[in-house]
Amino acid sequence: MKHYDSTLPYPRDLVGYGASPPHAAWPAQARIALQFVLNYEEGAENSVLHGDAASEQFLSEMASPAPFAARHLSMESLYEYGSRAGVWRILREFERRQLPLTVFGVSMALQRHPELCAAFKELGHEIACHGWRWISYQNLDEASEREHMRIGMQILTELTGERPLGWYTGRDSPQTHRLVADFGGFEYDSDYYGDDLPFWMRVQKSDGSVAPQLIVPYTLDTNDMRFASSQGFAQGDDFFSYLKDSFDVLYAEGDPAGLNTPKMLSIGMHCRLLGRPGRMKSLQKFLDYVQSHSQVWICRRIDIARHWKQAHPYLPPTPAGSGICRPGPDPGSSATPPLDCGSGPQ
C-alpha cells in the first residue's frame, strides 16, 4: 500500500470558499446558472473491437454485468441505442426549446458518427473533450494517458475545426489535472464534483511550474447515470423530483432578498440512458418547470468559464496566503471582488 508523505503539505482543499462564497454575478442578475451536459460516449467504450481485454461493464441497463473477453453483443446494442435513437430525441428537445448544451464528446465516438458531430456544431452546442477513449484511467500509465489526451484533442480539432476549450475525463487518474495543465489552452477543467461554484486551482505541472486552472465543477448526483446505479433512480419521476428539489434550493439561495449567493447547477445526461422514452418525459417536465422561472441563466460550460474569468479573475498568490482561492477583502460590497489565491498547495 502506498502512503502519502505526511511531511508534505496536505494536497486536498477541504475548505474551499468557506462560509463566504463570492457572489457569482451571473448575467441579467440570474439567481442560478443552469447547465446541461450531454455525454457522448457510444462507440468508445471498453470492447475487444477497440483492443481492450474485455467488454464494458459500466452505465448500461444491465446490473453488474460480467466482463467478457469477447464481443458482448447485448452490451454493444445498449450503447448503440444512444447513438442511433436516444441522442436525436434529446437533441430535438433542446432544439425545439432553443436551449444550449455542452457535449462531453469522446473523440473516438464522435469520429464514428460524423453526422452527429456536424449536428452538434450546426446547433451551436459546445463540444468539450471527453478524452479519446471512454475507459478508466485510474491505473493506466501516465505516458498512455498523455497520449490518449493528445489523440483526443487532435481528432476533435479535426472534426470540428476548433480546438476544444473544456476538458472532462470522468474516470480520471491522480495525474489527470496535471496532464491537462501540461497541455494548456483549456479554459476550464471539469474533473471535479466538490462545489457549487467555479474556482481557481493552482496545478503543479510536470516541469515543476505552477499554473492557474479554472475548475467548473460537474455532478454525479443530478445525473441520469443514477438510473444505472444501485442507489439511483427507478423511474422518471425520481429523476424529475431530485432535479426539481436541487433547482429549488439553489434558486432560493440566489434570491437577492435572502442569502443572495447565486450558484450553478449541472445536469448530466447520457444518450443511451435519458434518451429512452420512459425517461425522456422527466427531462421534458423539468425543462417546463425551469422555464417557468424568470431569473435563470441556461448556458454552456464555456459561457460559465468565460464569465467567471471576467467577474472573478485569478490573482497570483500572496506570501501570507493559504493557497485557497477565496473572495477578496470585501465580499459584502456590491462590486464583485477578484479571488485571492494564497501560496499554499491546491
Residue ranges and their predicted role:
Residues D207-F227:
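A structural motif
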Residues G328-L339, S343-Q346:
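A cross-taxon signal for low-complexity, glycine/charged-rich
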Residues T222-Y242:
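Binuclear metal-dependent hydrolase catalytic cores centered on His/Asp/Glu-rich metal-binding motifs
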Residues K2-L214, F240-I267, L273-S333:
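Catalytic alpha-helical scaffold of carbohydrate-active enzymes acting on polysaccharides/glycoconjugates
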